[in-house]
Amino acid sequence: MLYNINWAYTLARVKKKLYLCKLIIVWSVHCSEGRCYSTSKITIENNINITNSMILIADSGSTKTHWCLMAANGHCEEFFTDGINPFQQTSDAIKNSVNNQLLPQMAHLMWAGSINKIFFYGAGCTPEKSPQVAYALEAIFKSAKIEVYSDMVGAACGVLGEESGIACILGTGGNSCYWNGKEIVKNVPALGFILGDEGSGAVLGKRLVSDLFKNQLSEELKEKFQNQYGITAADVIDNVYRKPFPNRYLASLSKFCSENMDNPLIAQLVYDHFDYFAKRILPQYPAEPVGFIGSIAYYYQDVLKKVLADNGFQVGKILQGPMDGLKEYHKKDVEPTM
């Protein structure tokens, strides 16, 4: 017996409601006594009512953007593209990124045109820079209402929801705020990886390469680093001062720390990295639970929890990304199925 399995998306109208359906077609051929018989079976799954409009949620850091297309019944389709940051990209560059990376992933979704709200949370989305992102999205999603917020608001919504507390981002960059359940009421300026971004991957990478090339770590570690990355001090200077996205470059080097936490010198470097953040930033906020978003917080959470406990802070959620929390937070913004 031979089998052939195909699938496709199609639209179906049932009782005046429009659905996006995934069709799974199983076609088989069975031969017996010189005759062949063909049969087919069609299975419909993932029925999504698209009579009502949907929303698009974006969580964008400096390295990647996580997109979620949410239907009225709560079903989501998720996509990933490069990071979008209006401090580092023009509106045209942002538009090109969305056109070239997001839209091809959504090409099979014939219902993408029914998006009527977009909530974009992004690094660098200050009140002055947010219009750059809005203009780029408006040029593509012409019928959608677009709201652009900072990644800090996204982190607070994602990790705290409607509860009050301290929300922190520790990813490629770093930031923090006090959230009253509805809005940010206090924010210690992040200032970027050169002047601030305490606790971030970029600053951890900066500290690592500085200590390595200034002979503050062992020869064993320096040799291991060189064998893995094969870079010189001149390479670091070129990538940090002459090439785009130096923060991403430095953050990528911080991975060396996570791979060598069994080395006491690296373990101490990482502890001191978070301890500096805890002592310099967190005391400026009310004494409430501290929640974290970001890959650095997530992958170093054992050290982070110890540092916060040593400094007398209560740790809340530590999530790699805010999207699950944002999906829950924005359910109210999707029009209900009629």
Per-region residue spans from a language model:
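Short glycine-rich, Thr/Ser-proximal phosphate-binding strand/loop in the N-terminal lobe
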Residues: 55-94, 184-185, 190
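Short beta-strand-loop/turn "lid" adjacent to the catalytic site in phosphate-handling enzymes
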Residues: 87, 106-147, 159-160, 239-243
